[in-house]
């Protein structure tokens, strides 16, 4: 009995080896065994399968060999490791029904059938032959159909030329033949299809037991257990169809992810740009300065001269340096001279503007200023949450500069904070104006509401603050005596300076209603009276500033100067003023 059993086992092993050798030869040469027809080569991505069943009756069992032929033509995706099968292929229904009954039991006895009792079981062997173009790599993947064969030893189910994915848009692929799991495949939809990789290279009595992923069991009822053993070429995986919808596989997926990342970055950058480009942005802030602007901070005495400012415009600069959350809204209505320079047509600063902060005595001379311009620059340096809303209707040209204060001053106004004696001289001022300075250094919560209608020409230049300075305005902070002279100013303007050093939450609302008359203009050239009034205003302003600095609360110093020629100014004010409500 033992000799008979050994003889039968040896015959079975010989037959399996022969079948494997025949399968390899047929697959590599592109030849099909007798009994099968030659398949056409002109259809790319189509599978043709034929079956050849050879029954070898033995003493205690039967042995059947099933051949499945796949014909492929020159597919560039043959380097990929997956083949996708059509879940809705109607011509494969007959093949799937052949093995629905016994596939579960065959898979349950798969382990025992490969190692033990080979003469007592019904052996079912699947040989998949692939006919097609050349293969670049020999990535082999065991099939789920191979799990139906208890005698999987020595069975060749894939060769080097079968390493391709057959993929057609909108359709799923042809299913593997002679599989009990095809019941689930034929009932599935095209969008929920799975890519079944059914390639395996078996040689020289190597046992390969593959185990598919758990999602296989959810869709394929006949897959019980498949394990993978010691084979670098043995790859079994069921990928969802959406992962393999791309023809170029993981490369396309990674490329798509990279594009999505780039798109997200671009979207983020675009969002930031749109936030800044309400007033136009050039380099992380909006800075539009026509011909020449100089900002200097000097430790020693220096002379600043501004000459021949021909025409002004409107300049809006917005910069946010915020550590918390802030909202910055700037609404500007102007009727002065506007012309587009650079981007978004919102930058027009006078040809040469100099801002200087001096520690020692210096001399500032402003000459030949013909016209001002309008410049609005907004910046927030806030460590908490703040809302800054500035609404500035302007009719004439205003040039304002702000540093740590709110200041309404004419084109020939200087602000100084002196520890020692200082002399302020204003000469040759043709037209007077009104100067208001307000400074807040607040560590709590504050609200500042200032209503400022302006008629003169405004030019706002701001560095880390909101500023509106005339074309010939200097601000100086001197520790020692200094001298300032302003000469030959043709037109006056009004500058508004506001700064809030806030560590908590703050709100700045600066509407500019056209209610009160803040600007004094003299069309007939009464320069001596203007100079005298302005000198008084500055002295009064210094007093108000010292009182303001003593108390760290809301300090708004408003100085109004009644003029003797009020009727003439009122008439001129009404003529020059075109109210714009925001």
Swiss-Prot record:
GO terms for biological process: coagulation; negative regulation of flagellated sperm motility; sperm capacitation. Residues 1-23 form the signal peptide. It comes from the Eukaryota. Residues 26-65, 132-159, 272-295, 318-358, 379-417, 439-582 are annotated as: Disordered. InterPro entries: Semenogelin (IPR008836). The keyword Transport does not apply. Residues 31-40, 137-159, 325-335, 379-397, 439-457, 487-496, 506-524 have a biased composition (Polar residues). Keywords: Repeat, Secreted, Signal. It holds the Pfam family Semenogelin. It is found in: Secreted. One of its GO terms (cellular component) is extracellular exosome. Residues 336-345, 525-552, 559-582 have a biased composition (Basic and acidic residues). The keyword Signal applies. Participates in the formation of a gel matrix (sperm coagulum) entrapping the accessory gland secretions and ejaculated spermatozoa. Interacts with SERPINA5. Belongs to the semenogelin family. This is Semenogelin-2. It comes from Hylobates lar (Lar gibbon).
């Amino acid at each position: 009995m033992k000799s008979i059993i050994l003889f039968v086992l040896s015959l079975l092993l010989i037959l399996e080896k022969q079948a494997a050798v025949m399968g390899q030869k047929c697959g590599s040469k592109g030849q099909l065994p007798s009994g099968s027809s030659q398949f056409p080569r002109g259809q790319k991505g189509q599978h043709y399968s034929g079956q050849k069943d050879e029954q070898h009756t033995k003493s205690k069992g039967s042995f059947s060999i099933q051949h499945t032929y796949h014909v492929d033509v020159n597919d560039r995706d043959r380097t990929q490791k997956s083949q996708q099968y059509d879940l809705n292929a109607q011509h494969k229904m007959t093949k799937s029904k052949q093995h629905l009954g016994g596939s579960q039991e065959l898979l349950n006895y798969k382990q025992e059938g490969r190692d033990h009792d080979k003469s007592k079981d019904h052996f079912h062997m699947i040989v998949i032959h692939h006919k097609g173009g050349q293969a670049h790599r020999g990535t082999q993947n065991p099939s789920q159909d191979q799990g139906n064969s208890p005698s999987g030893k020595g069975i060749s189910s894939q060769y080097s030329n079968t390493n391709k994915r057959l993929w057609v848009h909108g359709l799923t692929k042809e299913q593997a033949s002679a599989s009990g799991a095809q019941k689930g495949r034929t009932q599935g939809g095209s969008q929920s299809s799975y890519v079944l990789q059914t390639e395996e290279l078996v040689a020289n009595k190597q046992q390969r037991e593959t185990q598919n992923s758990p999602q296989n069991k959810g869709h394929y009822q006949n897959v019980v257990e498949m394990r993978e053993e010691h084979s670098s070429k043995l790859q079994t995986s069921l990928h969802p169809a959406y992962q393999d919808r791309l023809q170029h596989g993981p490369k396309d997926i990674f490329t798509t992810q990279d594009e999505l990342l780039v798109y997200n970055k671009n979207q983020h950058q675009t969002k930031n740009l749109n936030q800044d480009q309400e007033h136009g942005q050039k380099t992380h802030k909006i800075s539009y300065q026509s011909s020449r602007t100089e900002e200097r901070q000097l430790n020693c005495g220096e002379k600043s001269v501004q000459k021949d400012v021909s025409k002004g415009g409107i300049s809006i600069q917005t910069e946010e340096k915020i550590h918390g959350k802030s909202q910055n809204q700037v609404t500007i209505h102007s009727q002065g001279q506007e012309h587009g320079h650079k981007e978004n047509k919102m930058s027009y600063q006078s040809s040469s503007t100099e801002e200087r902060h001096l520690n020692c005595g210096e001399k500032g001379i402003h000459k030949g200023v013909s016209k001002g311009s309008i410049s609005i620059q907004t910046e927030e340096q806030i460590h908490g949450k703040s809302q800054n809303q500035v609404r500035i209707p302007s009719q004439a040209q205003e040039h304002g500069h702000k540093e740590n204060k709110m200041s309404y001053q004419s084109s020939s106004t200087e602000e100084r904070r002196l520890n020692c004696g200082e002399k302020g001289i204003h000469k040759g001022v043709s037209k007077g104006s009104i100067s208001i300075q307000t400074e807040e250094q607040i560590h709590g919560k504050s609200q500042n509401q200032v209503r400022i209608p302006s008629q003169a020409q405004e030019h706002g230049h701001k560095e880390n603050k909101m500023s509106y300075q005339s074309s010939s305005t200097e601000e100086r902070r001197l520790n020692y005596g200094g001298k300032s002279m302003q000469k030959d100013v043709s037109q006056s303007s009004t500058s508004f300076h506001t700064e809030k050093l806030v560590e908590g939450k703050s709100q700045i609302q600066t509407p500019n209603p056209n209610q009160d008359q803040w600007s004094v203009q003299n069309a007939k050239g009464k320069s001596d009276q203007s100079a005298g009034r302005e000198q008084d205003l500055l002295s009064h302003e210094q007093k108000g500033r010292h009182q303001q600095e003593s108390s760290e609360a809301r300090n708004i110093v408003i100085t109004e100067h009644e003029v003797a020629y009020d009727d003439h100014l009122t008439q001129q004010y009404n003529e020059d003023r075109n109210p714009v409500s925001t």
